[in-house]
Amino acid sequence: MNKKITYFLTVLLLGTVLFSEVFAGGAKRNGTAGAQELLIPSSASGLALNGSNISSITGLDAVFYNPAGFGGTQTSTEAMFSNLTYIADISMSYAAVGVNFSELGSLAFSLRTLNFGDIPVTTVDNPYGTGSTYSPSFVTLGLTYANSLTDRIRVGINLKLVSEKIVRTSATGFAFDAGIQYQGLAGLDGLNFGITLKNLGPQMKFDGPDLIRSASEAEAKRGTNFYTIDAASFELPSSLELGLSYAYNLANDYKMVVSSAFQNNNFSNDEYKLGYEFVYDDMLFLRGGYAYMGEAKDNEYQQFFGVTAGVGVKVNIGFEMVVDYAYRAAKFSESNHLIGVKFNF
């Protein structure tokens, strides 16, 4: 068993080094990746810490940030629902359910949808609108598996089916996340380490009847000709993250968790994240976080979001219910608000 664990860790670390080389220079490719909905957070507790807690996050909250943390689920069944008010009147709805099969690991299913509202239809002949509306359909389905290899090591993988549709033009692809968490680093209880690779997958491409166009030449003897616009393929917003956290007791019922993470983005500036969580009696949670983009310091338009904060409350009503709220400041739009509810059975 120890040999298998050593082999797994070696492969993961080598893969991490390889991907870090591949991701180098991500800032030079700002704005060139698609499927940006994969970057929208679904966990209020994680967002409140600005995603800095990839080494310690557990349960269904971990599905988005580090699937290995889902292997730390302590209950037999867990359900989660959240809603985010994003930017430009866009909102995100998320639902997930997970089952713990003990030594066999944990399995979760998730669904994420975006709501764009009704958008007026405009054409070349009617640039101010035709009177009709449309609403894009962006849906992501997820299947997550995680397990604890030992009392210290957790691993997990998250498979995602990504679907984007705008009227009769659509693109479909898949991506996966993989992660690991190591508890008690260097034999120190409370010191945790995490690695996660996110949104790895093949390129996506739009296609559909709405890309078919007609053309005719004034002096052509033939009738109208039809051709299809060949849309360019686009890559997914992949990233590599390394995280470290430390939890320590302040008093009998009080605990403080300090977490940090480095995020190496393939298509944007790298980020340095820091978060603090104050816990009272495993019942009340106060959180705050910040992300810093060093390469974006000379360009205010590259760091869109600012500080984060949030609160969580856990109550027992025959089963555990957790209500979390997160706030994220934004520079050029309204601030984000994410509310999540979890049920543990």
Kindly give the residue locations of the regions a language model identified.
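Bacterial N-terminal signal peptides that target proteins for export
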Residues: 1-9
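Short intrinsically disordered, low-complexity coil segments enriched in acidic
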Residues: 2, 19-20
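A general marker of short, structured functional hotspots
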Residues: 3-4, 15, 141
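Bacterial N-terminal signal peptides
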Residues: 10-17
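Subset of outer-membrane beta-barrel
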Residues: 21-345
